[in-house]
């Protein structure tokens, strides 16, 4: 390709000015002509290069678009999967919350029943203890009253009875016992 360009410039430089065509180095005078020549040379000799360059660029752009589209599809699938997992986790969390509320309610009812039962048992035990202590106190008071009554009766009988009266009471009691016991009983 460089050989072609060199040949073209060589031919153009050998042409004389008298022939009407030549290479003018004054940019301001021949700018359009020079540009047309350069573009013509570039289009004819560099066309394949530019076409292949543009095709490579087009393929790279298409490949980038396809890659981006694939990544978008993968991201969309992952997003959908994550949303599904989130919804599933949300449902499970709601179920766990409902179950925990139900369990807490059942435990609360169970504990309240246990508290009621324990309270009833404690009240029953309290009442039984009070009744036992009352019976014990009443029994103790009875024993003391009986002991005091016997002691007092004994003291009174000692002070009132003399020997003669004692013999008489003893005979009377023996007589009463004798009537109660019949000869067949002995």
Swiss-Prot record:
It is found in: Plastid, Chloroplast thylakoid membrane. Pfam families: ATP-synt_B. GO terms for cellular component: chloroplast thylakoid membrane; proton-transporting ATP synthase complex. GO terms for molecular function: ATP binding; proton-transporting ATP synthase activity, rotational mechanism. The chain crosses the membrane at residues 27-43. It is a single-pass membrane protein. Keywords: ATP synthesis, ATP-binding, CF(0), Chloroplast, Hydrogen ion transport, Ion transport, Membrane, Nucleotide-binding, Plastid, Thylakoid, Transmembrane, Transmembrane helix, Transport. It comes from the Eukaryota. The keyword Membrane applies. InterPro entries: ATP_synth_b/b'su_bac/chlpt. In plastids the F-type ATPase is also known as CF(1)CF(0). F(1)F(0) ATP synthase produces ATP from ADP in the presence of a proton or sodium gradient. F-type ATPases consist of two structural domains, F(1) containing the extramembraneous catalytic core and F(0) containing the membrane proton channel, linked together by a central stalk and a peripheral stalk. During catalysis, ATP synthesis in the catalytic domain of F(1) is coupled via a rotary mechanism of the central stalk subunits to proton translocation. F-type ATPases have 2 components, F(1) - the catalytic core - and F(0) - the membrane proton channel. F(1) has five subunits: alpha(3), beta(3), gamma(1), delta(1), epsilon(1). F(0) has four main subunits: a(1), b(1), b'(1) and c(10-14). The alpha and beta chains form an alternating ring which encloses part of the gamma chain. F(1) is attached to F(0) by a central stalk formed by the gamma and epsilon chains, while a peripheral stalk is formed by the delta, b and b' chains. Belongs to the ATPase B chain family. This is ATP synthase subunit b, chloroplastic. It comes from Mesostigma viride (Green alga).
């Amino acid at each position: 390709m460089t050989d072609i360009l060199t040949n073209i410039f060589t031919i153009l430089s050998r042409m004389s000015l008298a022939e009407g065509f030549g290479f003018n180095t004054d940019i301001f005078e021949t700018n359009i002509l020079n540009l047309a020549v350069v573009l013509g040379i570039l289009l004819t000799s560099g066309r394949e290069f530019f076409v292949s360059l543009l095709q490579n660029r087009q393929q790279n752009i298409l490949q980038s678009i396809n890659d981006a589209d694939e990544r978008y599809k993968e991201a969309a699938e992952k997003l959908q999967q994550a949303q599904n997992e989130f919804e599933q986790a949300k449902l499970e969390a709601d179920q766990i919350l409902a179950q925990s509320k139900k369990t807490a309610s059942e435990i609360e009812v169970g504990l309240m029943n246990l508290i009621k039962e324990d309270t009833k048992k404690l009240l029953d035990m309290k009442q039984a203890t009070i009744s036992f202590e009352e019976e014990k106190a009443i029994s103790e008071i009875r024993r003391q009253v009986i002991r005091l009554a016997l002691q007092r009766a004994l003291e009174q009988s000692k002070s009132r009875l003399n020997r003669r009266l004692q013999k008489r009471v003893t005979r009377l009691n023996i007589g009463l016992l004798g009537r109660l016991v019949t000869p067949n009983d002995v």
